[in-house]
Amino acid sequence: MAEFPFEISPMFEGERVRKEGMFVELGGPKSLGLELVRAADMDAIEDDKVTIVGPDLKDMEEGKTYPWAMIFNIGGELVEPDLESVVERRVHDFINYCQGIMHLNQRYDVWMRVSKDTAGKMDSFEPFGKAVMMLFKTELPFIEKMQVTFYTGKEEVEKQMELAKEIFKARDARTKDLHDEDVDVFYGCTLCQSFAPTNVCVVSPDRISLCGAINWFDGRAAAKVDPEGPQFEIAKGDLLDAVTGEYTGVNEIAKKLSSGEFDKIKLHSFFDSPHTSCGCFEVVGFYIPEVDGIGWVDREYQGMAPNGIGFSTMAGQTGGGKQIVGFLGIGVNYFYSPKFIQADGGWNRVVWLPSGLKAKIDEAIPADLKDKIATENDATDIASLKDFLEAKNHPVVATWAAAEEEEEEEEEEEEVAVAAAPMMMPAAGFQMPAMPMMSGGSGGGIKLTFKNAKITIDKLVISEKKEKK
């Protein structure tokens, strides 16, 4: 558009600004990043006003990372506090319409980059702010007036961050007494499909969006004021499984929105047809087979999990709108859900959390498990994690003995089967070839153990090996 120094179009959604093409980075994993929308009286808003508190774009050094906070105030006859988070989530959309400006995540995890090319066309964030507000008022006509303040100084961003977290906490508390069985409809969101085309985000009273920004009430408000927008109703349909959270309506929308890639989503399952994961999730869960437990790591944690992998690597494996068995992206508020991964043990399956995340969700953790869940201060690898869980008698430890007994029973069954094999009568005319003894050295042979494996063999050919003369 001519009045702005950069092009604006939905075609730029999904555009990535790589490090080598970046002028500055705002927020992200190395700093603080925040976005917040607040409803206000019309008289308190100066329409289209952009205020910059701290260094402006022209004052920033190329290649550096700066703290960043965006506070939008909106007003209008139909504007109410229930719409704040709905409008807030569209920030992701509209910023990504701006060429050369990348926006990821939400709330207190915002990560932005401005490309060198775009920075070369403007020396201030003001035209960027005006462009985003223009898009908001064009796409969401119930917004009659809007203003924005950008904060780029660390002290002020930290102050705004603390205020915002209290607001987010109050929003999330609204669904505490409402559950999946109490409503007839859930809500879907397709905001992340520009980055994760097959992602199907289902928001229910007991499961907040992966990004943590949209709860059931937010979805309802969004679908009401913007019926053609990215949030929409999902008819629950019939309940197929109350434990896993499987509904016919959710399965139908999963198949439709993923273009047939998935035909079912179980809202409260970690392993069996789990919810898809986009890339905006706040936390990623990962299965640790050595202890038969599940660990969780959030964006704020910069270290390695006991499996030797950090958040960014696991996020790359998990995201993209896929169902990756063994990994699961969630919003932080899902930890507070009474249906939290209930199909796979719930909190009794959780074995590791970063200390910062553990402190943040302290109220969600059952009292009898708080000292049994390890952090990076207790376990940094699988061996130390196993020792910790054993010492604390974590619930998963009981499954280890059961697994060992099962393995022993399987070995006994195998031995019986081998002993009985010579007694089996072959079909007439068929001579079983002599089978050579497999040896693994002094250890007494080779042992193969398959657990929970599904093996399909179309054809098995056993033939005698003839030596060359």
UniProtKB/Swiss-Prot annotation:
Pathway(s) this gene product operates in, as recorded in its UniProt entry: One-carbon metabolism; methanogenesis from acetate
Catalytic activity: Co(I)-[corrinoid Fe-S protein] + acetyl-CoA + H(+) = methyl-Co(III)-[corrinoid Fe-S protein] + CO + CoA
E.C. number: 2.3.1.169
GO biological process, one term: methanogenesis, from acetate
TM region(s), chain numbering: none
Binding site for [Ni-Fe-S] cluster: 189, 192, 278, 280
Presence of the UniProt keyword Iron-sulfur in the record: yes
Cofactor (UniProt): [Ni-Fe-S] cluster
UniProt cross-references to HAMAP family, sorted A to Z: CdhC (MF_01138)
Quaternary structure annotation from Swiss-Prot or TrEMBL: Monomer. The ACDS complex is made up of alpha, epsilon, beta, gamma and delta chains with a probable stoichiometry of (alpha(2)epsilon(2))(4)-beta(8)-(gamma(1)delta(1))(8) (Potential).
Family statement: Belongs to the CdhC family.
Role played: Part of a complex that catalyzes the reversible cleavage of acetyl-CoA, allowing growth on acetate as sole source of carbon and energy. The alpha-epsilon complex generates CO from CO(2), while the beta subunit (this protein) combines the CO with CoA and a methyl group to form acetyl-CoA. The methyl group, which is incorporated into acetyl-CoA, is transferred to the beta subunit by a corrinoid iron-sulfur protein (the gamma-delta complex).
Protein name: Acetyl-CoA decarbonylase/synthase complex subunit beta 1
Organism: Methanosarcina thermophila
Organism ancestry: Archaea, Methanobacteriati, Methanobacteriota, Stenosarchaea group, Methanomicrobia
